[in-house]
Amino acid sequence: MESIDYSKDIIEDAEKEVTEWASQQQKEIENLKSLEEYRRNFFGDISHELKTPLFNIQGYIHTLLDGALYDEKINLEYLKRAAINTERLHLIVEDLDVISRLDSGENPLEMKVFNIRKLASEVIEEMELVAAKKKIQLTYKEKNPRNFHVKADRESIRQIFTNLIVNSIKYGKEKGVTKVAFYHMDEYILVEIADNGIGIERKHLPHIFDRFYRVEKSRNRSQGGSGLGLSIVKHIIEAHGLTINVRSDFGIGTTFGFTLKKA
């Protein structure tokens, strides 16, 4: 009768387990390295973003203290510039606080049934004066869109509409158009916000939801804002367990789309 070598099977099983364990450990090490790199980059970005307005404010104030305060030709202008940079600093801190609360789950979602079209109309009305400065028209893709009821956190979705519409105005063309559209899907409503602005090059699309990511740093910084608007949008959508996507053609325009659960 032929004997069975159990020791060989045990050794093979042990080798397999060790190999799997080593592979898992390597993945964890790589993940930790990736997280550490992300942490370094993130804090470096925060430092850079805060330094810019702080240095500007400091420069204007010191210039005023050195005598410009009594020069009527420039004192008011320097105070205005300092105020603008103070507002930018405030925006960055406020948006960082929003992201921190979203990350930590401190702000649980208040899921309610509401009319998404009505909410969009409210935000459009609020943004019309801002859009008018660039003669941008805020409208719906359909002349008489139907009412759609969804179940979500209403104030968070308001923040999404606001951030995306502000983004479309900021990078929109003079006399351009931003359109909001709603589409029925099986269990969801697809919401799209499209503009005919400057668009985004394909190489930048995977990164536009990253914190502080700027397609063109000098141009974007001159546009103001915190650099966190789209990151906040992504956080809110993911908190709902859903996804957001973006399509863009450079020089033609950009469309953001996200889904919400039907009520």
Segments and roles (model prediction):
Residues 84-92:
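Short alpha-helical segment of the dimerization/phosphotransfer core of two-component systems
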Residues 104-109, 147-152:
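Conserved micro-motifs of the catalytic ATP-binding
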Residues 110-125, 138-139:
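A conserved beta-strand-to-alpha-helix junction within the catalytic ATP-binding
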Residues 168-169:
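Short helix-loop "hinge" at the ATP-lid/N-box region of the Bergerat-fold HATPase_c
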Residues 175-187:
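Short beta-strand/loop element within the Bergerat-fold HATPase_c
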Residues 241-242:
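Conserved glycine-rich
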